[in-house]
């Protein structure tokens, strides 16, 4: 990819996410999913990894996605739709790995996520968010294994990069990239972001523009 193309995708991404983004749907079950239309990308990650904050930072909207300091608060698939002519949606998935939730609730979330991943033809990519302070955990590996089997394109995004020292961030990257080598279905490029500073947001938006271009 040339620098000119990278700059073009970054600018197109800026324009797309500067547009009007709205909440359109909340699905507590597969039966209540919205009709499939256009392309969708979903954000998965452990509880409190920063999914809602990332969506807000991407769209430049402080309160588009609700953020919570209570782990496991998001219990539904939350859909956001971009500008009318974009035909593009973001999906905030329920956080996983919250051990204090009732077992029945965890089973329900797990079933919802697995069924969504395997039955949504409009789902172009899943972005798996990993907290840069903690790196890949066993529960993340379990989710990556599920994604390997689901035939859905996925890419790992480090969040909260501003909350670790540069040397720790560099080591986290090395460790996560090593872990990803066990998952050949993973997109090879690791993205590093901070919702607080905006670092990595242009590159993440550009990645989605490339995805739209590939699927159009």
Curated annotation (Swiss-Prot):
Entry binding sites for GTP: 45-52, 72-76, 92-95, 159-162, 193-195
Molecular-function GO terms, alphabetical: GTP binding; metal ion binding
Residues that hold Mg(2+) according to the record: 52, 74
Family matches, as Pfam families: MMR_HSR1
NCBIfam families the UniProt entry points to: GTPase_YsxC
PANTHER family associated with the record: ENGB-TYPE G DOMAIN-CONTAINING PROTEIN, MSS1/TRME-RELATED GTP-BINDING PROTEIN
Family: Belongs to the TRAFAC class TrmE-Era-EngA-EngB-Septin-like GTPase superfamily. EngB GTPase family.
Full protein name: Probable GTP-binding protein EngB
């Amino acid at each position: 990819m040339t620098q000119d193309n990278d700059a073009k995708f970054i600018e197109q991404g800026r324009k797309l996410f500067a547009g009007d983004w709205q909440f359109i749907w909340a699905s507590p079950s597969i039966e209540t999913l919205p009709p499939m239309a256009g392309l969708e990308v979903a954000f998965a990650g452990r509880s409190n990894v920063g999914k809602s904050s990332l969506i807000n930072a991407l769209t430049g909207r402080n309160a588009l996605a609700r953020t919570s300091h209570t782990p496991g608060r998001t219990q539904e698939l939350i859909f956001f739709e971009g500008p009318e002519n974009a035909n593009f949606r973001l999906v905030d998935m329920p956080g996983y790995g919250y051990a204090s939730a009732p077992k029945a609730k965890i089973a329900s979330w797990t079933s919802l996520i697995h069924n969504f991943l395997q039955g949504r033809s409009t789902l172009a990519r899943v972005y798996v968010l990993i907290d840069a302070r903690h790196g890949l955990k066993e529960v993340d590996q379990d989710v990556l294994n599920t994604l390997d089997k689901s035939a859905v394109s996925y890419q790992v995004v480090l969040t909260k990069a501003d909350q670790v020292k540069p040397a720790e961030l560099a080591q986290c990257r090395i460790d996560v990239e090593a872990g990803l080598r066990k998952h050949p279905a993973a997109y090879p490029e690791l993205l590093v972001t901070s919702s607080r500073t905006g670092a990595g947001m242009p590159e993440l938006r550009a990645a989605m523009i490339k995805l739209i271009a590939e699927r159009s």
